[in-house]
């Protein structure tokens, strides 16, 4: 299920933080408020994001979207992405259904 949001949901869009603690705080707030969290511009911060998603127990349910609308578009679960960096214009979608 790759919906950005479902009926009645709230979407929060944030630029990727440079600190683990900031990302953990965003995730905690979204989990508590049951909002969908989109993290933009992941790029070189992917390793930080990956470790935080693992620590929070959501690596297998979070989605990544790379090169959307392009021939090389990728939409998959974050746990499936094995490279060390992502393109600058990438998105992580975190849901708490």
Residue ranges and their predicted role:
Residues 1-29:
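Class I SAM-dependent methyltransferase SAM-binding "motif I" and its flanking Rossmann-like core
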């Amino acid at each position: 299920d790759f919906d950005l949001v479902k009926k009645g949901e709230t979407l929060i869009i944030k630029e990727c933080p440079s600190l683990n603690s900031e990302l953990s705080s965003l995730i905690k707030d979204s989990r508590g408020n049951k909002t969908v969290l989109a993290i933009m511009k992941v790029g070189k911060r992917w390793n930080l994001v990956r470790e935080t998603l693992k620590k929070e127990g959501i690596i297998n349910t979070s989605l990544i979207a790379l090169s959307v609308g392009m021939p090389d578009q990728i939409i998959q679960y974050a746990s499936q992405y094995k490279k060390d960096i992502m393109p600058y214009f990438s998105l992580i979608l975190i849901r708490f259904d």
